[in-house]
């Protein structure tokens, strides 16, 4: 597994004997190779593509359909982005790569949740110096520092291409942070979804407002009060924790805010920068440097980040939004976000500063009502503009071999703006729902132009593939699996409010609880000798799962009398491989329009089993896999009748004459699919 050091320092040690061997960045092959270009549009939906092609609004994709082919692309079980992209990367089911949900649980700690794609492992204890504990990473101490570890198992398809000498470029692909190593020097990669911001989260904005009266944190953001005295306020920007302290504490940077006395404008002074903004304006990227205090006999450590300021409102209530603090691409420090590490220097030299965090469109700011719809669309537009610049860089660098480029816009904008039915929208009027769904249509037409530019540039000299990991649908109603389990006697006691959070109320009684829900699609049996407090015998597991599955499939929405659950998957029936035993016992596949309730994803219990989704996050895909397939287009004829994600890696290997490994069970898109194989993708 790939490991990177987190916030290490060299403690005044210089080793004259130290030498480094550096594999050349994206080493060119001495022979020419076929050209294969893959564009990944996260969440691009086949139904919407078909409708827009029929209406003449996606001419370039339609041309690909007619010249080569277009198919729905079978997605992963469940159809969550890290699961799906890991299946694309390995050409295998989740039992091989070990990612089953955004959220996994640690059975040794009963149901403690953790992020499925990466983890930070603690290092050695270090050297006690007053309030500090310092890792001595040099000889003779050789302390191990904390390290971020990629959890994804299996072998990525590009390792086989790298070994064969094929040049590979991969940009922003999810489920690959820290980026996997290139053993032969033919691959360069910029990591995407999973890259943290400088605070260690996955997108923590900071919001300063006169309407906020105390510092508070909510999912995705920190809210800070603004107290103006004579149109001036002294504020602090929160940075990374100083992990050299025995009790880690967040670092901060002071900055001053000056509101114009008469105009809708303000000035911000932070470190050596002055930022002047009018209401509604965004700043450029601003570099900020956080100081991490060290013992007095050592120099302090410094961490560089970047952020943008948005002056949301000057009067009557002052409001300032600051983006999550991203890793500085010109000075990433110990945070490796590219492979090889120096590849980020090439990108930054061309593009300057840009979003590096894995989640770039700030959906949390819209969900938490910090952004309006229009403001979120503007911010998402900044992200897309940067991605277009990055694509230009990638195409200019590309000569032959494999180029993979990923766009998040088609997913994260769709989560907030998709609405393709006459049903009542959770938060918008019918007119607003139509208007913002039109924003998704407009986005698809922009992506169609991207495809057109690439086809025009390379024509028939390259194999060009356009793909997505899953489709999309409305998220109208939410189903609280834990509430249902409680009401049906599987989760105890009858007044249980959470399996994790005592602040919610009565906790689960594990001596009586037989099953619980965690994550977006997972249900776990409280199995003896597996869960720390397990009570269900292995001999009773099968009957219990059959009983729960039958009851879930019978659940109907009292509002519409529609079935809520379309499919209940048994893990042993859909997963094989070394990690299969880590999977949930059941994977709940919801019907379109339904999804797991927000509360149930982290083990909480609502009052109602089924309720309206009232979040701005009004569309989703974490449902039954057959209801939200992705797309695949090609400029070469597709001969596979029922392609799926696990066919993509074999397709790419075949294009370069590389034999697929036994772990890949799919086949090339350009070869016929056997009848039996098509029935069991």
Regions found by a protein language model. Give the residues of each.
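Bacterial Sec-dependent signal peptides at the C-terminal "C-region" and cleavage site
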Residues: 15-32
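N-terminal Sec-pathway targeting helices
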Residues: 1-12
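A long, amphipathic alpha-helix that forms part
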Residues: 27-30, 377-403, 413, 419-466, ...
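Secreted, luminal/periplasmic, and some membrane-associated catalytic domains
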Residues: 32-34, 41, 55-56, 66-72, ...
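Short amphipathic alpha-helices and their capping/turn segments at secondary-structure boundaries
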Residues: 332-346, 389-404
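Low-complexity, glycine/alanine/valine/leucine- and proline-rich hydrophobic stretches
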Residues: 593-642
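A solvent-exposed, charged loop/short amphipathic helix patch at secondary-structure junctions
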Residues: 127-141, 419-438, 606-613
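Second-shell loop/turn segments in exported
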Residues: 47-51, 146-147, 638
């Amino acid at each position: 597994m790939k490991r990177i050091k987190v916030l290490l320092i060299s403690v005044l040690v210089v080793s004259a004997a130290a030498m480094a061997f550096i594999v050349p960045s994206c080493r060119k092959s001495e022979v020419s190779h076929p050209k294969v270009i893959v564009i990944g549009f996260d969440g691009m939906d086949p139904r919407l593509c078909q409708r827009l092609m029929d209406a003449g609004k996606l001419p370039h994709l339609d041309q690909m359909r007619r010249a080569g082919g277009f198919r729905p692309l079978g997605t992963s079980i469940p159809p969550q982005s890290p699961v799906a992209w890991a299946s694309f990367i390995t050409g295998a089911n989740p039992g091989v790569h070990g990612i089953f949900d955004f959220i996994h649980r640690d059975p040794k700690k009963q149901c403690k949740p953790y992020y499925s794609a990466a983890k930070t492992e603690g290092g050695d204890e270090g050297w006690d110096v007053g309030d500090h504990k310092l890792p001595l990473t040099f000889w003779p101490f050789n302390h191990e520092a904390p390290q971020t570890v990629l959890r994804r198992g299996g072998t990525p398809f590009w390792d086989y291409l790298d070994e064969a000498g094929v040049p590979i470029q991969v940009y922003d692909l999810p489920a690959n942070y820290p980026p996997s190593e290139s053993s032969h020097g033919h691959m360069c990669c910029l990591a995407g979804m999973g890259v943290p911001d400088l605070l260690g989260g996955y997108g923590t904005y900071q919001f300063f407002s006169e309407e906020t009266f105390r510092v508070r944190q909510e999912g995705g953001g920190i809210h800070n009060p603004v107290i103006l005295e004579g149109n001036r306020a002294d504020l602090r920007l929160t940075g990374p924790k100083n992990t050299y302290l025995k009790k880690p504490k967040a670092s901060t940077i002071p900055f001053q805010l000056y509101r114009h006395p008469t105009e809708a404008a303000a000035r911000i002074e932070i470190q050596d920068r002055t930022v002047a903004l009018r209401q509604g304006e965004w700043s450029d990227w601003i570099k900020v440097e956080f100081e991490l205090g060290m013992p007095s006999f050592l120099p302090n450590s410094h961490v560089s980040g970047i952020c943008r300021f948005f002056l949301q409102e000057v009067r009557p209530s002052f409001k300032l939004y600051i983006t999550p603090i991203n890793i500085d691409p010109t000075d990433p420090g110990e945070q490796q976000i590219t492979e090889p590490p120096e590849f980020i220097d090439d990108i930054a030299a061309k593009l300057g500063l840009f979003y590096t965090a894995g989640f770039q469109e700030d959906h949390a700011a819209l969900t938490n009502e910090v952004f309006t719809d229009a403001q979120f669309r503007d911010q998402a537009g900044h992200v897309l503009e940067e991605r277009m610049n990055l694509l230009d860089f990638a195409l200019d660098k590309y000569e032959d071999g494999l180029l993979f480029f990923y766009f998040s816009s088609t997913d994260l904008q769709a989560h907030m703006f998709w609405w393709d039915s006459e049903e009542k929208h959770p938060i918008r009027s019918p007119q607003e729902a139509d208007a913002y769904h039109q924003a998704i249509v407009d986005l698809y037409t922009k992506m169609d132009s991207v495809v057109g530019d690439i086809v025009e540039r390379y024509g028939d000299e390259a194999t060009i593939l356009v793909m997505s990991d899953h489709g999309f649908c409305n998220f109208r109603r939410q189903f609280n699996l834990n509430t249902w389990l409680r009401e049906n006697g599987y989760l105890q006691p009858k007044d249980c409010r959470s399996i994790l959070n005592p602040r919610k109320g009565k906790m689960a009684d594990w001596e009586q609880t037989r099953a619980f829900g965690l994550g977006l699609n997972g249900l776990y049996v409280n199995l003896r000798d597996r869960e720390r407090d397990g009570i269900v015998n292995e001999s009773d597991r099968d009957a219990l799962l059959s009983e729960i599955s039958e009851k879930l499939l019978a659940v109907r929405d009292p509002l519409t009398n529609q079935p809520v659950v379309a499919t209940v998957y048994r893990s042993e029936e859909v997963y094989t491989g070394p990690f299969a035993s880590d999977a949930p016992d059941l994977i709940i596949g919801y019907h379109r329009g339904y999804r797991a309730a927000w509360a149930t994803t982290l083990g909480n219990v609502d009052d109602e089993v089924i309720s309206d989704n009232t979040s701005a996050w009004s569309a989703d895909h974490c449902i039954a896999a057959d209801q939200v397939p992705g797309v695949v287009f090609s400029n070469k004829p597709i001969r596979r009748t029922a392609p799926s994600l696990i066919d993509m890696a074999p397709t790419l290997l075949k294009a370069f004459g590389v034999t697929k490994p036994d772990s890949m069970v799919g086949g090339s898109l350009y070869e016929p699919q056997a009848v039996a194989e098509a029935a069991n993708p």
